[in-house]
Amino acid sequence: MILHCNYEELGALKQGANVLLGHGRGEGFSIAAPPEGRTEVEALLPRLGGDLTIETLAEQRWVARAIQAIVESLKEEMDLFIITAHPADESAVASYFQYGHALSVLARVTEMGQEMEALIEVVTGAPPSPEVAKTFLFPG
């Protein structure tokens, strides 16, 4: 399955990943990522050059966890810019749009996961087990 992302969404995800990993604009403050979320974001970052091909439910789940961590990072960054500057400050407004774009991708990848789970259940007659989540392939 393909998760389509536009230019703004990819930019927001990259920015959020860099903030979460301690690079870029957010270097001046700390946003704590759990080690699992950090590892998943590091693995996702090189794939953020275009649409994402997701072949298994297990892959969708780790991509969703990485994007969730990015969204949380962008939300914290947005809150910080609003509190330290002003809601109408340029950095606060820009961070709002970054957060919104990433949140839109999170909603789509979550919906994709629900559709994948439903399709697996229809085909196999049972909810997806961890093994099936890793081995049931979806076309790209």
Label every PLM stretch briefly.
Residues M1-G140:
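Positively charged, low-complexity terminal tracts
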